[in-house]
């Protein structure tokens, strides 16, 4: 069996949220009061349950798993969990999305456990502005985490910058320069109308064509389109000639990437979300806790792919996604 949706897209990438809790409160991701302020830890899948679902997906052809949150490093035992799933035959890569606040403490253990690489959310290089965007974040701590990750061999590390008009759009060029200095990829991301947090910031939407025009003006003819197969999915990537740096752009709103979608998302509470921008989902926690067999679980996952929608409707109707929070989906 393989995972094929109704539009003949092969699903080979699973994003797994291990928690919807986060030590930051970025405005486009999480409401100020938190996503589930009254949520119980018993609602979370435990690591054995998560591992069992991941094994089923890998047996069905998934080759890449990304660990997300919330902030995954606030959940204890993450290196051990990665070590548990790393040997699965057919799993080629385990990646992490993090705010890097705790990465300096865990980078070596994560690499030893089998983590391949990390994406770091960093929306400003100015400490006060960074603190404001994240509602309390510490830029110095994050950059120390980045350095620790690079030193541990988590390579490549990618920076994800959500560009917001009037908030941090004045730092596009500075972020490019920092990427060149560190030899990392910087990915610029449009704001997306997901959940009350994301919808509330759509007046700060900064379109991708403006971002790329400024990047091109800054680096000139040294921006070269990247070629070759990649798991980067929606990111359009460019090399900067003469450096180890790359630029990536994710234009979920102005130029959607649905025709090549190869991923689904598993939330920490056991919901299999089939589209980032629609409510289509399947509950896996209940059958797991009721003792479903491995083969029946695989068949349930195969059947779930038949419910995957063709595309999102970010440009047409934001209201169909206001009840989800980005922090629960893991991006």
Swiss-Prot record:
GO BP terms, alphabetized: Mo-molybdopterin cofactor biosynthetic process
SUPFAM superfamilies xref list: Radical SAM enzymes
Reactions catalysed: GTP + AH2 + S-adenosyl-L-methionine = (8S)-3',8-cyclo-7,8-dihydroguanosine 5'-triphosphate + 5'-deoxyadenosine + L-methionine + A + H(+)
Protein name, as recorded: GTP 3',8-cyclase
A molecular function (GO) term: metal ion binding
Subunit comment: Monomer and homodimer.
Recorded metabolic or biological pathway in which this protein acts: Cofactor biosynthesis; molybdopterin biosynthesis
Source organism of this protein record: Hydrogenovibrio crunogenus (strain DSM 25203 / XCL-2) (Thiomicrospira crunogena)
Entry EC no(s): 4.1.99.22
